[in-house]
Each structure stands twice: as C-alpha cells, then as structure tokens.
C-alpha cells in the first residue's frame, strides 16, 4: 500500500447550478396539519397552488381537512381589494367553523412577488380574532420541498415559551397529554420513572416525525438516562416546548438548518451537531453524540446495532455489492447514502438541491468515516445538479439503482434503469433502530421486482416492450 492510498479521502463538492426537479415547499402542509392536531393551515396563493395541493393531498373536501386555500384574484394582485379585510374575513370564518389553537399563513411565490406583507398583517389580525397567527414563507423559491417544514418550524420556534408556566390553568393545559399517558398508573411508578434520568441540562428535539418515532427516539435516550424535555413541533400548539437560553437542541432531519439557526440566534439555544438517526448506524452515532455532550457513558448501543444488522441480513444480501445513484430531491440524500454504503452498496454520486455544510457537518464526517471503514470511494456530492448532465453520467455509470424524484422515474425505467422515488423516504418511517427494515424494504423493492421478472422469464418481454 502506498502512502497516497493510506491518506484519508476528502469530500469532493461540485455545484452545477442546473435544472433539477422537486415539489413545491407548500406540500409541507400535507404532514404538518396532521402532526399539529389543533392547527389550521391557510395557503395564500393562486389556482396553481390549489391544484397542486388538491392533487398532492388527495383529501376530499367532505373530510373537512384542517387546511384551506386562499385564492388570490385579480383584485388582490392589482391592489383593488384590501388584503387585511379579506384575510380577516377568512380568519373569522376559520374560527367560527374550526376554532383552532393556531392559524398558520403559508406564503407562496405570488405573495412574494406582489410583496404582500403577511408579517405586518398577522399581529393585528391576531389581536382582533384572538387566535395566534404564525407566518411561514414556504414558497417555491426554496431549493427543496422539505424546506417548507423548515420554514414553518423556524417560525414556530420563535413562539415557544421562554419560561415554564406558573399559572395552574396554563400548567393543566400544557400537561394534558402527559396526564393522559400517565392515566391509570400509580404515582409511585411515575416518580420512580423520573428517578431513572440522569441530571443534565434540558434537551429539546426538533423535526416533524410520526408519533411512534417520537416515542422510539425518546425511549432510546431514556435508556441512557436522558430525558427529552419536549419536541418541536408538539402534537398541539398549546404544548410547544419551553426553550430558555442555554437549553440544548438536536435535529432529527437533515433539512432543518433554518430552524437550527433560529433556535441558536433567537433563542440562544445550544445545538448538538450529530449525524441524524436514520439507520442503525446513524441512530447509534446520534445517541452517542448526545451522551458525550452530557458526559454520559453510553451503554448497550454496540450490541443493539449489531442485533439490528443481523435481523436484516436477508435484505443486505440483495444489495451488497450493488451501486446506487442519488439524483437529488428531498435533502435526505447524504444520510441515506451513508446508510446504504454501510449496507454494502457503493454510491457513485449524491445529487442534492441544497447543502448546508455547517448543519450537516457531523453527517458529512460520518459519511467519510463510513466509506473508509467499508473500503469504498467517497461519492461526489453535486449541489443543485443539472439533470441533463446527470442523465449522461447515469448512462455511463449504469448504476443498479437510481433514487430520484418522480419526474425522472418513468423515463429512466423506460431506459432499463431501476429507480426508487425519493419522496417515499420523506413519508416513510425511517428514523431509529426499529425502522431499518422499512428503509431496506423500500430500497430493495425495485431490485426484488427485477428478480421476480427474471425468475418468471418475463425479463425478455419487458426489454422488448421498452424497444
């Protein structure tokens, strides 16, 4: 082995500033309105935004979902109508029909272009109707659709209480869910559970994940004696976590850099920079990093990770030695690539619409470390990739699997390249130790389909159909 071979490989970043495809960030309404149960989302935009939401959500109007579309008309754009009066009328109707704890205004490209001052209108509307109004500019000017959640959470972070409530009524309201979870349990059991935690500064997690994931990740930290003080967003707006100066915060998704910045600058919180808890390797590194910050010796993580890898060996055999190519869509690419490399795959290229190197620094370091341990080359990271150039590279490299946005899936399949929609990873449960099988189920599905076609002798028919 030469000296050059022994040197650690460095990450190679490129920026093509080309045309790539991703959804509009207003799609964040699809999962956030379900996560925050007492909220109402009002998207202020054109008919195009309405058509997109209607198609993306797939919720019939009879279901009375907790979101609506405020369509801008010619009178709004030409300033013939008064924005304040129109929004006040809509908010009063929302209060009368649904009476939410918070109304979230989602700005769109059009509100940006016509310079609609939503931030200026919101405080006055809020005082008149008596319901908090949060303004989030989750418009198509962002790089990726997942950044819509980032914008909403950054806006909500500024609404988190700065100190714990002192009034009994406020305490009752904020602890309603906790009381429900402890219903039927003896007081001694609750006190004993509290004594299991180590004394450490308060820790708040941020990132919208399904309730089972919240429970799983909180339990993983509880096993190490770490108590999670709260989650942003909470199940209810009235239960937003208290964030005081000096509190520690940790993100569970790679696309929340704006929220992290807001928590550090506005709320003076301390960010724990760690790999994200995606896959057993990422979850272990995430827990270990939090433990190291609180000077806690982690226990049982190595055995837990080994057990998970052993339980998914049947899936690993399908992808070990195969190659993957990320076209870039939802900002989960770095974490997923690192996980798949750990599974035994090689990654040619990681396309990503936007790369915050500070927020993802720990994940990038972990990617390099994983590549070195697995003995594979470090993939090139292409920011704002040009899809035309990517298609040329895919044609040359011929990867076994391409993880891509929906726009390119069918054209690539028609050229004999196996694909997987990246949007599926956004909505699937991929965090924590317990969901490793779910990620591998998604990744291996196209490969298993190809194997089934081959076994049935239909592979030749499929190739003829492509021609």
Curated annotation (Swiss-Prot):
Known EC number: 1.3.7.7
Name of the molecule in the record: Light-independent protochlorophyllide reductase subunit N
Subunit field text: Protochlorophyllide reductase is composed of three subunits; ChlL, ChlN and ChlB. Forms a heterotetramer of two ChlB and two ChlN subunits.
Annotated keywords: 4Fe-4S, ATP-binding, Chlorophyll biosynthesis, Iron, Iron-sulfur, Metal-binding, Nucleotide-binding, Oxidoreductase, Photosynthesis
NCBIfam families reported in the protein's UniProt record: DPOR_bchN (TIGR01279), PRK02842.1 (NF002768)
UniProt cross-references to Pfam families, sorted A to Z: Oxidored_nitro
GO biological process, any: photosynthesis, dark reaction
Family note: Belongs to the BchN/ChlN family.
CDD domains found in the cross-reference section: Pchlide_reductase_N
Function: Component of the dark-operative protochlorophyllide reductase (DPOR) that uses Mg-ATP and reduced ferredoxin to reduce ring D of protochlorophyllide (Pchlide) to form chlorophyllide a (Chlide). This reaction is light-independent. The NB-protein (ChlN-ChlB) is the catalytic component of the complex.
Note describing how the cofactor binds: Binds 1 [4Fe-4S] cluster per heterodimer. The cluster is bound at the heterodimer interface by residues from both subunits.
Enzyme class at the top of the EC tree: oxidoreductase
One of the record's GO molecular function terms: oxidoreductase activity, acting on the CH-CH group of donors, iron-sulfur protein as acceptor
Cofactor(s), names only, from the UniProt record: [4Fe-4S] cluster
Encoding gene per record: chlN
InterPro entries: LIPOR_BchN/ChlN (IPR050293), Nase/OxRdtase_comp1 (IPR000510), Protochl_reductN (IPR005970)
Record's keyword annotation contains Iron: yes
UniProt source species: Leptolyngbya boryana (Plectonema boryanum)
Residues reported in the UniProt entry to bind [4Fe-4S] cluster: 24, 49, 109
Catalysed reaction, written as an equation: chlorophyllide a + oxidized 2[4Fe-4S]-[ferredoxin] + 2 ADP + 2 phosphate = protochlorophyllide a + reduced 2[4Fe-4S]-[ferredoxin] + 2 ATP + 2 H2O
Pathway: Porphyrin-containing compound metabolism; chlorophyll biosynthesis (light-independent)
The keyword Metal-binding is annotated on this UniProt entry: yes
